[in-house]
Structure formats: structure tokens, C-alpha cells
Amino acid sequence: MIFRDLKEMGILGINNRVGRYILRHNKRSMYPLVDDKVLTALRAEAWGIAMPQNYLIVENYGSLKNLHSKLLNYDSFVIKPANGSQGNGIIVIKEIIKEEKDGEIRLLCRRSNDKLMDIDEVKHHISGILSGLYSLSGQSDKAIIQAKIDKHPIFSNYSFGGIPDIRVIVFEGYPVMSMVRLPTKNSDGKANLHQGAIGAGLNLKDGATNNAVIRNLVVDCHPDTGFKLSGLQLPFWREILELAAQCYDMVELGYLGVDIVLTPDQGPILLELNARPGLGIQIANLAGLVPRLEKVRLEAPKNLLAKDRVKFSMENF
């Protein structure tokens, strides 16, 4: 009974996602461009697509010796694994505290949750990243020290601590579904659904929120701010969808998750890409992916520019 109901709603399951869409539409040879955030950044730069600036790439344990002096150049930053997933291993440093004593500068890092880390703790965390603790494959990895992005004022009342991001599912270059992920206290200020962030579905026609869930349970208000979650209208909506559509051209993956952040000064910029995007976006939108994917497969024109593909999506979904 439940299976039939889900099928009638057009809900895409894990097996069909892999068999009908990922395996058929994603070239394995292109996966490194998406899985490795360092390669993604290089590709995006070549395509003129804005991303957060990478300050440092830590590739081996020897590089940790000079880390202290290098971090003194920054007021804030983000540490993330190059090949991580689901937000694991990411630490946001919102403030660098520099204390001078006996001619030496001591460095303390204040995290987004206000906890302090000294330089040895930072090195220890990066060592874990290098060992592959957070990587998709479990193999050794690189650590990225990246510019911290400021929160767009539209989210002031809808986010606890961290920066919300926007997930767009793109199929053969056409945006088919989207949601905004809003950090909560329970998610430790991270826009991560698995850790307790809010997933709020977005109407493709106008970028307004239509429904919201926490751990698959429908919610009406943000648990930490009390603000109502429905009807939030995102600015730069067409630009957000066009950026997502352009990422298909950039990496040539037919079934793609595109994560975008809204910045106060640059507008929408690319955060990262995902070749195996999760299915929780359907619950956030109370809608199934299958009808939209099949409409693109059967009816969408081929060889259109990104802006024209976005026009089709906004009119049909």
C-alpha cells in the first residue's frame, strides 16, 4: 500500500536514482571534478563561475609545521576536506584571536558555535582530514582552508549560527527541484539535514518556500528564531537557477546536485557539487522527482543555453 502510494506520487527511490539516472547520465570519468573540491574550484575558475576563495590547500603532514604563521594572515576561515560529504569534517572559524606573549603570537580560533580551538587542535583536526577520516573513499585526502562566507540578510531570522545553502537538482541541464537548508542549534549551525538542519522546499517558478521539514517531520516555524518558514522569497532567483544550469555545462554530469550560497556582496555563488544528491529534497517539497525528470527526458528541447533551460523549468515546474 505504502509502496503504491509513493509510486503514484512519483517519489524517486535509491535504486531508481542509481539505475535510471546516475548510471545512465553521469560519466564516471567526470566524477573527480565533482568529488574533489579542489578540482571543482579550478574548473569553476576556468568557466568564470564564482566560488569561495581557497586560501590554502594542505596536502601533507609536513605542511602543518608552518600552518600557524599562514593562518595569522586571516581573520576567519573554513576548514573542509577536499573529498568530504554531508558536511562531515567542516569547521567554521568565525574569529581569529591573536595574543602576544614574550614576543610570540598565540593563535586561538573561535568556531561558529563559540567554542575555542588552539593551533594544536586545528592541526589535529586537519591531520584527521589528511588521513581520510572524512573522505568519500576513505583514502587519504587534502584539507582546504577557505574564505568564510557572510550570511545574506534575507536569512537573518531563518538561520542559527551558520550559512544557509540552496540545493538545486539539475537533470540534463534543467533545474527540476530545489530547497534551502537552514542551520539550527541542533545542527550545530551547519546547513546539514542529517544533523538537524531545516530543509525548506522552494517553488521553481519564483523561489518562495512552500514547505519545511526537520528530520523528515513537517515544521511551520524555525525552532530557534520562531519565524514562520513558509513564504520566504529568495532574491536573485533566476540567477540562482542559471548558475545551477551552467554547472551541468561545466562538468557534463546529467544528474547533479548543485549547492549555492547567497552572499551579501556577490549574490549567488557556487559552494560545491554532488554527483549523488540525496532524495530528502522530495520530502522538503512534498513532491516526487520522477514526473519532473521524465518530463525533461521526454519533452525538454536539446542544446539550449542555460538561461533558456531555466525558462523551461520555471514554466513547467
Question: Residues of each region from the PLM?
Answer:
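A short, surface-exposed helix-loop junction/capping segment
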Residues: N15-S29, L217-S230
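Active-site nucleotide/adenylate-binding loops and adjacent lid/helix of ATP-dependent enzymes
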Residues: R20, H25, L33-P164, E172
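Short, His- and charge-rich active-site/binding loops that engage polyanionic ligands
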Residues: K80, E95, K101-D118, G173-V218
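A short, polar/proline- and glycine-enriched secondary-structure boundary/capping micro-motif
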Residues: I90, N186-Q195, G280-N285
